[in-house]
Amino acid sequence: MTETRGARATEAFFGRRKGKPLRERQAAHLEHLLPLLKLDLEEPAPADLTALFPEPVERIRLEIGFGGGEHLIHRAAEDPATGFIGVEPFVNSMAKLLGQIEAKAIRNIRLYDDDATQVLDWLPAASVDQIDLLYPDPWPKRKHWKRRFVSQINLDRFARILKPGGLFCFASDIDSYINWTLIHCREHAAFEWTAERAADWLTPFAGWPSTRYEAKARREGRSSAYLAFRRA
């Protein structure tokens, strides 16, 4: 499948940027805490991404579109030896996560609050151990499918920054997006689907915390799929 990379101005995969008004403390977190944790893409990325973190880390994990932040906070708290980079353009979600980072004194998270493709293009080659794309916007209407984050162009980006043997993990409750991701990844030479049996993609990833998106899917009668692809 051949796709032409769009101009940066059109390369947006998210909808609204802000929802309900922020509380005073949330606004303060955005003003004072986010600048301390935000990646500076005006500067070259360090060759070794562990240098981005104040404490020693051994691995780097990128989560694109962390939403409510439940998964990112859970993973960062349970695995201090991993440095996490979280990307989320939605202001309210970022403000919520910053509050959790402060409350739990998390020190192994760095953040970016705009288009994830900017981060993907900034990161060095073969620098990331795992990429998580969990319950992304499915853009259900066919005319909007080109906005889905999973594309051959973005898989090229993933392939560039993942270390050999690194993982791309995807979760969704939308059948059309699950199939879309399987097709795109199986058409991409750099990725191998790790599943050997149905249980492998019907069972949540190891250490998986339940998220509000997953709970909403269950309430509405939808099951989720958990797909893992290894960088060849």
Swiss-Prot record:
Its EC number is 2.1.1.33. It comes from the Bacteria. Keywords: Methyltransferase, S-adenosyl-L-methionine, Transferase, tRNA processing. InterPro entries: SAM-dependent_MTases_sf, tRNA_(Gua-N-7)_MeTrfase_Trmb, tRNA_methyltr_TrmB_bact. Substrate binds at K141, D173, T211, R212, Y213, E214. One of its GO terms (cellular component) is tRNA methyltransferase complex. GO terms for molecular function: tRNA (guanine(46)-N7)-methyltransferase activity. Pathway: tRNA modification; N(7)-methylguanine-tRNA biosynthesis. It catalyses: guanosine(46) in tRNA + S-adenosyl-L-methionine = N(7)-methylguanosine(46) in tRNA + S-adenosyl-L-homocysteine. The active site is at D137. Gene3D superfamilies: Vaccinia Virus protein VP39 (3.40.50.150). SUPFAM superfamilies: S-adenosyl-L-methionine-dependent methyltransferases. Pfam families: Methyltransf_4. S-adenosyl-L-methionine binds at E63, E88, D115, D137. The keyword S-adenosyl-L-methionine applies. Belongs to the class I-like SAM-binding methyltransferase superfamily. TrmB family. Catalyzes the formation of N(7)-methylguanine at position 46 (m7G46) in tRNA. PANTHER family: 3-DEOXY-D-MANNO-OCTULOSONIC-ACID TRANSFERASE/TRNA GUANINE-N 7 - -METHYLTRANSFERASE, PENTACOTRIPEPTIDE-REPEAT REGION OF PRORP DOMAIN-CONTAINING PROTEIN. This is tRNA (guanine-N(7)-)-methyltransferase. It comes from Rhizobium meliloti (strain 1021) (Ensifer meliloti).
